[in-house]
């Protein structure tokens, strides 16, 4: 019976729950030093997160934290595959001690569908995923009628996933270490494309296949071709090798060069990489101490 006494002392705390039907975590951040937690409402910030049966957050409430001391509620939902395709904006509601709102989705929509928010009917960020087990995002829309997915004048972020092509011409910069471990930058030409499976095993560390990630920003339109896009090339380890942006469809490259240990040793901004490529005919290697961004290799 002695071991039960401490447990019985804490049982009364269980009746203070914000909800008798939902799992939740109630956290308090104090704005003043306290040893007992006995402070006023203005001296603390209380946040409550409710969870479903799978342990996923379904509602977040910042208790009494609006300018007029109302609760700030954020609705969270998932699709049939468990993905969070829509991230809703929070809305303010009468302070109810952080209790769970069963009509949070309806209240969110009605809160923003007013003149104050230009009668917004999509108060959420929306992400569309490709139909594959990888669940890679292919399109992202922002809140607001002008930014929603499917709008005639669409302003969404689009993503494409490809592999290296011959037209990409990605330089294969490497780091060479001398006998005294002095690093030098070496241009090995361009990365090879379309290696056979047997060749990949043998030459994986010399010319690994690169993966190409294309991001088209909210202002992109088909007539832009490459303008308003960014191309990110990564190796089989997931390391960024090249970031390519465009101005009037002219590419501007930033290279990231790693040593044999995987450490990022060089970052070559567009001007530096352009000069190095221009001088690649006579270039063997450049000591790090002699390489100056924007200057000729010496």
Report each predicted region and the residues it spans:
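Sec-dependent signal peptide recognition
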Residues: 2-9
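Beta-strand elements of repeat-based all-beta scaffolds
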Residues: 3, 17-298
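N-terminal signal peptide c-region/cleavage motif recognized by signal peptidases
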Residues: 12-14
């Amino acid at each position: 019976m002695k071991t039960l006494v401490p447990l019985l002392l804490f049982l009364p705390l269980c009746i203070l729950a914000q909800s008798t039907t939902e799992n939740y975590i109630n956290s308090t951040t104090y704005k003043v030093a306290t040893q007992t937690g006995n402070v006023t409402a203005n001296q603390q910030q209380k946040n409550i997160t409710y969870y479903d049966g799978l342990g996923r957050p379904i509602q977040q409430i910042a208790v009494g934290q609006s300018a007029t001391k109302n609760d700030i509620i954020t609705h969270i939902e998932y699709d049939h595959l468990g993905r969070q395709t829509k991230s809703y904006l929070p809305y303010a509601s009468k302070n109810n001690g952080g209790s769970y709102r069963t009509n949070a989705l309806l209240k969110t929509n009605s809160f923003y569908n007013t003149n104050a928010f230009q009668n917004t009917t999509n108060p959420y960020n929306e992400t569309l995923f490709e139909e594959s087990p990888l669940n890679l995002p292919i399109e992202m829309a922002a809140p607001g009628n002008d930014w929603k997915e499917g709008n005639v004048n669409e302003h969404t972020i689009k993503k494409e996933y490809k592999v290296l092509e011959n037209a990409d011409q990605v330089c294969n910069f490497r780091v060479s270490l001398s006998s005294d471990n002095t690093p030098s930058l070496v241009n090995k030409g361009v990365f090879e494309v379309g290696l056979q499976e047997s060749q990949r095993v043998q030459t994986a560390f010399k010319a690994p296949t690169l993966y190409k990630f294309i991001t088209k920003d909210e202002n992109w339109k088909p007539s832009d071709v490459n303008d308003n896009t960014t191309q990110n090339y990564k190796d089989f380890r997931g390391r960024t090798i090249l970031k390519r942006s465009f101005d009037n469809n002219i590419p501007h490259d930033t290279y990231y060069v790693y040593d044999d240990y995987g450490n990022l040793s060089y970052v070559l901004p567009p001007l530096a990489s352009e000069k190095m490529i221009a001088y690649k005919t006579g270039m063997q290697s450049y000591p790090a101490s002699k390489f100056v961004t924007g200057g000729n290799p010496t």
